[in-house]
């Protein structure tokens, strides 16, 4: 999806719904920090607008009670947010393995998003090659650990100039390897 189309919201909703069912999930987020994710989840769970939470302008006792109950519910969920700003595939692999050892299983790994991974662009300017190495390594990690990985990525700008704005897998930014290494591609628009 293009920026602002809800990629982070989508992966967050999938992860929190899995966690609510008792299935451990992790999101590696290079775009938002833990506090932003917590605010998003509390807002959704308590049905209180995010801007009211951020400013602390809750005017009714019931709102404070809803936030408190929400925080208590969410604190016990098997949902892990890693907001390390500079992640490599090697770091993701190590952290996933540690979480697996600690929890026994993971229902999902979300990565927000491919273009921000440190491995991208580190191979002498060949972006497609870098992306291919990352997607191949993540595919191997998914198979090795038997865990689905939701890897968020952006679309090329060309989709905006077309009459039909419905994206296809050919619109994935910078590499056909994303399509080759994916089991499923979901596009948001």
Predicted segments — roles?
Residues 84-95, 124-132, 167:
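Active-site glycine- and acidic-residue-rich loops that bind
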Residues 10-15, 37, 130, 134, ...:
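Extended, hydrophobic alpha-helical segments in both membrane/secreted and soluble proteins
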């Amino acid at each position: 999806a293009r920026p602002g189309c809800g990629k982070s919201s989508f992966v967050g909703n999938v992860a929190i719904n899995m966690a609510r069912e008792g299935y451990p999930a992790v999101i590696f987020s290079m775009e938002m920090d833990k506090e932003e994710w917590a605010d998003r989840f509390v807002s959704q769970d308590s049905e209180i607008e995010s801007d009211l939470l951020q400013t602390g302008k809750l005017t009714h006792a019931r709102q404070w009670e809803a936030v408190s109950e929400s925080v208590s519910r969410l604190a016990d969920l098997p949902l892990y947010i890693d907001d390390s700003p500079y992640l490599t595939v090697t770091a993701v692999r190590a952290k996933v393995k540690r979480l697996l050892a600690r929890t026994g299983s993971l229902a999902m790994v979300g990565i927000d998003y491919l273009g921000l991974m440190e491995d991208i662009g580190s191979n002498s300017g060949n972006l497609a090659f870098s992306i291919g190495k990352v997607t191949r390594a993540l595919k191997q990690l998914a198979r090795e650990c038997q865990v689905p990985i939701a890897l968020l990525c952006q679309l090329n700008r060309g989709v905006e100039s077309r009459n039909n704005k419905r994206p296809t897998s050919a619109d994935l930014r910078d590499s056909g390897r994303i399509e080759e290494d994916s089991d499923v591609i979901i596009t948001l628009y």
